[in-house]
């Protein structure tokens, strides 16, 4: 995530072996690997979304400029396109690939800052997804996933999933394809799954002691 110069605690520079996957440098090293990076992101998405992820394409540190020269641009840590397959068949031309942005963030952002940042990210991402003359219903789903070592909303939840909805009637279907998922590494409310708990613990403390399943074992080999 851009503007990462302020971390939760002011720390002296650490050696590479002291870094964890929430640290920007190590995370970028992981996602930048031509093959390992895609597999790492596939495992992350599989664990976070709790469903099968067949194949992904990853663009590390994707830069999206502002809409004008004096407007704010953004840098996405891991821009991911999921290739959606139907029952193991080839990718259908009419099926739009879902877009994911995974953002480990150790910067403590108070109040409105984090939600407004995500609003801005979504807006700029969308400007690059729809070619001229293309129908709006071809706009792909976009999910921004933020992984945090602090609780962004104070409810001690490991998972906060944010979607737009009708205020007056929650039963109204409003599928704009926009979703934010905030993951608090230490959250306990909401009965988070064991695999997600273990993965987030490993991301915060990426040591062999926290390797608890085959997926994390594979990620740990990439880290080493």
Which sequence ranges carry the predicted segments?
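Elongated, amphipathic alpha-helical interaction scaffolds
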Residues: 1-224
């Amino acid at each position: 995530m851009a503007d990462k110069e302020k971390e939760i605690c002011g720390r002296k520079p650490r050696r590479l072996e002291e870094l964890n996957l929430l640290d920007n440098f190590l995370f970028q090293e992981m996602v930048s690997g031509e093959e390992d990076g895609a597999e790492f992101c596939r495992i992350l998405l599989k664990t976070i979304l709790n469903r099968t992820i067949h194949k992904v394409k990853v663009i590390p540190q994707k830069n999206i400029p502002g809409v004008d020269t004096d407007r704010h641009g953004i840098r996405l840590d891991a821009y991911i396109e999921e290739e959606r397959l139907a029952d193991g068949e080839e990718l259908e031309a009419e099926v739009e690939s879902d877009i994911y942005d995974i953002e480990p963030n150790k910067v403590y952002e108070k109040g409105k800052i984090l939600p407004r940042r995500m609003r801005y990210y979504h807006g700029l991402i969308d400007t690059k997804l729809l070619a001229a003359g293309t129908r709006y219903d071809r706009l792909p789903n976009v999910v921004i996933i933020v992984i945090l070592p602090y609780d962004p909303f104070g409810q001690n939840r490991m998972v906060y999933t944010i979607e737009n909805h009708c205020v007056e009637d929650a039963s109204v279907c409003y599928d704009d394809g926009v979703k934010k998922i905030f993951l608090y590494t230490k959250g306990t409310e909401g009965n988070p799954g064991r695999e997600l708990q273990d993965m987030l613990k490993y991301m915060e403390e990426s040591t062999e002691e926290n390797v608890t399943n085959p997926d994390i074992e594979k990620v740990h080999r990439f880290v080493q």
